[in-house]
Amino acid sequence: MGSPSSSMTEGDVECFSEYMELWIHRLRIEGLRLWLSGILRIQVGLVSMENLNHQLSSCGFALHRDLDKNYVFRVMYSGCFVQLEHGNYVIVLNLLKRVSRFGGRTQKFMMKCPAVLAPPNREYIQCDSDSIQVTREIPVDNWNNELDWSLALRGSLVVALEDSSLIQINVEMHKPNITVQGRRDTILSPVQVFASEGHFLPLKLVSGNYAYSMEATCPNGNTSSSNETVLHIYKRRMGLTKRGGYQNETLSVSSVMVEQTDTFSWTETTDFVQLIIPTSYIQQNKECLSQTGEKLQQNFYKIDAVLTFKETNHKMHWTMENTSPCSELLKSHSVYDDPQKANFTTHSPTWTAERPEIPADYTTNLTPSVSPSTTSTALQTADPDTGTTSMPTPQLKTTEVFNTSTPLSSQEVFSSTLYSPNHNSTSSSVHQ
């Protein structure tokens, strides 16, 4: 099977990392409605697309209208009636097309895409007081072709990779990874999640009909003096997605795991997961030099999290390193020799997230990038009060940021789940 055509006509199928899409003319949509009603044994109506997609989601299907009032039918590779045949995902649609008031004829449409390995699902973020750096694996399409990528900042500013300085971003490509870096005050947008504020990077790689997320968040300011560290993780599919696609898809978190500690809480909004961890459990310090050469101290921490979503078969592996500015004084109570001395209370916020806003100015120079590396361990135990049993996680030993041969553990780490019907948020926690 060859590469997909750049033009989209009836019967053409587009292949992405986790799903395939078929364009259907509005005059043939009645045939799709009848086919869905028959094969799913439900009453399919097109009046409310939101209600319809709620019905279809249990089978991995979705239907959307385009700007010309035609339709795009999306099928997850893990969806109902999708078969794996000779290395391809295949589903056949029998659509009725009326030719008169009294009858019609059936036409078959085959949706077929090459089976692929798990899409790139790791993101490595480095933040300090001045800059942000994001590293991800460079993706290929379903036919294993390399793509010519451009950068899209805030969905509207699109430049070639070699012209990234026009939007105040540095790009380095060291296969298999790509790293982007810029100053926080020029490329990040403020975002409010519940009662806390973070800074969001609205950046994607784009190529033809493909988009690939480089979106990331940095925590707000210096949190080293706070008892709790609040982090925001942007929810999205990590592989190739439809460029300019339908942004109303909501992913629901089914589990969260943190490598460094079992003591944390999480809540989610439509767009973000908010992770709250006792600062004393993760914070470390190291020596640094002032501009005059004086030896000072600075706080830093690293978090490795694994998120599982109900709507996807692939986990999201998220790593954040945050470094505070050099400081002459470090609070002695910020880091405990015994983490059990720290108090931690989980809570359920009652405020919903807003979309990130565009900052008014972005004109400052960039700082040089740093090559990242990953090493993390986690150990979990049984909790006699909750009955939660956890398995130890083996130590990761990697020389590259994204060593796909060493997947992180997907063990469950929760003991309770709270639900707030007024704000559609979930809070879960685990205590050692």
From Swiss-Prot:
It comes from the Eukaryota. Disruption phenotype: Morpholino knockdown of the protein does not cause observable left-right anomalies. Disulfide bonds: none annotated. Expressed specifically by cells of the ciliated left-right organizer. It holds the Pfam family DUF4556. PANTHER family: GENE 572-RELATED (PTHR38653:SF1). This is Ciliated left-right organizer protein containing ZP-N domains homolog. It comes from Danio rerio. The lineage of its organism: Eukaryota, Metazoa, Chordata, Craniata, Vertebrata.
